[in-house]
Amino acid sequence: MNKEIVAQLREWADIYNDLQYFQEDPIAFPTRFAELSARGERCLKDVEVAAVFAAHFAWGRRSMIVRDCGRLFDEMDWRPYDYVMRGVWRDEAVSVHRTIKWSEVAAICGRLKEFYEGHESLEALTVNEMRVGIFGQKEDAKAPNKKINMMRRWMVRDDGKVDLGVWKGTSP
């Protein structure tokens, strides 16, 4: 890559990989739960559930994503893991974010509950296992899996700024 392009990419990274830029971004939700977890007020599973849904909702205008994630976490009483494990989810054919309906959220909650009944963390799941087992999508070797890879980046990479780095057993 030529030096000018590298310099431009680094400049953009310095501008956009900044907490200020991400205050109104889907990562704000798992970040909030990671901060609560660090203080012992929530657990890693809260961070994981928040990351699953924030990544799932991460398409469209950021202001809409943040608004709709806020509605979702209000429904969860800001205790996402407890909400999932209770097994009583809002299950309506009404949209919560764009084309995502509450019934789809309930289905993901059901798969998360089933997973967490036998496992401590989502960290060991492959991209395909997450795609099929958590998001309920068909296997597709050619799928870009953008939301899953974005979520994994949040959870694995620890840049000291934006990404959380809470999954310590996975190398970035």
Feature roles, as predicted:
Residues 1-172:
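HhH-family (HhH-GPD) DNA N-glycosylase catalytic core used in base-excision repair
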